[in-house]
């Protein structure tokens, strides 16, 4: 029941900032506060290409010994973390209600290659228990990327993926990113259920990752209650993105974008 309520019920901190305010949960409030989400018309992503983990230099013993100690106590850090998590969850839920589960509408066409920005270097264990790193293992050819942190967001991503049947040559990759260690380990425990939900041929394309960030505004994933999808080019730049459940117009724009991106890459 909670799932159905959430589905019928998002503001992109990506484009518009608003003052946080708790809202009434009445039906009247829902109808009165519905707004049309903006379109993602400018490139999103990181300005600098991430360094692959194998190239990151580990700190030396001297650097570890001379690193300044934290001035806050473990209890204080824990309290700050819990407060941040609480604010993030409440704000995310209010955003889902405000825009009916849609952070933004997809761009009508691909972002130009020269202005496109970089995707995060997500990494984790695949369903085949193999370690995967986005830039190390998936760079080199275009792919469709689904990003989510819960079943609701994953189902939204699947609503996009079901329209990709004519493009079976385009790899589909999944990242289930958790910012909570308990949820991360629960995902690992119930991994069998996840395996049953996707074809076996995709098991090595699905990773479960841990990252303690509560949002990724640089790539337009400001609300982890919903799922985001991306078209990633051969250099791991974000050329197109979507969120929530797709509209018919967005699906047609996605199909056109895939044809253009793949044909250019082949050519």
From Swiss-Prot:
Q: Which GO terms describe its cellular component?
A: mitochondrial inner membrane; mitochondrion
Q: Name one Pfam family in it.
A: ATP-synt_10
UniProt keyword annotation of Lipid metabolism present: no
Q: Where in the cell is it found?
A: Mitochondrion inner membrane
The protein's UniProt keywords, in alphabetical order, are:
Membrane, Mitochondrion, Mitochondrion inner membrane
- GO term, biological process aspect, one: mitochondrial proton-transporting ATP synthase complex assembly
Q: Which GO terms describe its molecular function?
A: unfolded protein binding
Is Membrane included in the keywords of this UniProt record? yes
Q: Which InterPro entries match?
A: ATP10
Per the entry, what this protein does is: Involved in assembly of the mitochondrial F1-F0 complex.
By sequence similarity, the record places it as follows: Belongs to the ATP10 family.
What protein does this entry describe? Answer: Probable mitochondrial ATPase complex subunit atp10
Source organism per entry reads Schizosaccharomyces pombe (strain 972 / ATCC 24843) (Fission yeast)
The major lineage groups are:
Eukaryota, Fungi, Dikarya, Ascomycota, Taphrinomycotina
Gene responsible for this protein: atp10
């Amino acid at each position: 029941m909670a799932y159905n309520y959430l589905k019928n019920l998002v503001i992109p901190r990506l484009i518009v900032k608003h003052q946080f305010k708790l809202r009434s949960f009445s039906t009247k409030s829902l109808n009165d506060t519905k707004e049309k989400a903006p379109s993602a018309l400018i490139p999103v992503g990181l300005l600098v290409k991430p360094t692959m983990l194998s190239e990151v230099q580990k700190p030396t013993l001297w650097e570890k010994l001379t690193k300044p100690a934290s001035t806050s106590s473990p209890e204080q850090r824990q309290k700050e973390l819990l407060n941040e998590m609480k604010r993030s969850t409440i704000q995310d839920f209010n955003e889902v209600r405000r825009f009916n589960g849609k952070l933004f509408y997809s761009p009508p066409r691909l972002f130009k290659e020269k202005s496109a920005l970089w995707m995060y270097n997500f990494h984790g264990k695949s369903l085949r228990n193999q370690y995967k790193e986005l830039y190390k293992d998936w760079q080199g050819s275009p792919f469709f990327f689904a990003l989510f942190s819960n079943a609701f967001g994953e189902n939204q991503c699947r609503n996009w993926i079901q329209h990709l049947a004519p493009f079976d040559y385009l790899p589909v990759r999944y990242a289930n990113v958790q910012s909570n260690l308990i949820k991360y380990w629960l995902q690992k425990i119930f991994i069998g259920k996840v395996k049953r939900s996707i074809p076996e041929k995709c098991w090595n394309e699905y990773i479960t990752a841990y990252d303690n960030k509560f949002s990724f505004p640089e790539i337009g994933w400001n609300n982890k209650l919903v799922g985001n999808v991306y078209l990633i080019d051969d250099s791991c730049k974000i050329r197109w993105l979507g969120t929530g459940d797709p509209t018919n117009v967005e699906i047609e724009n996605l199909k056109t974008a895939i044809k253009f991106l793949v044909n250019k890459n082949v050519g």
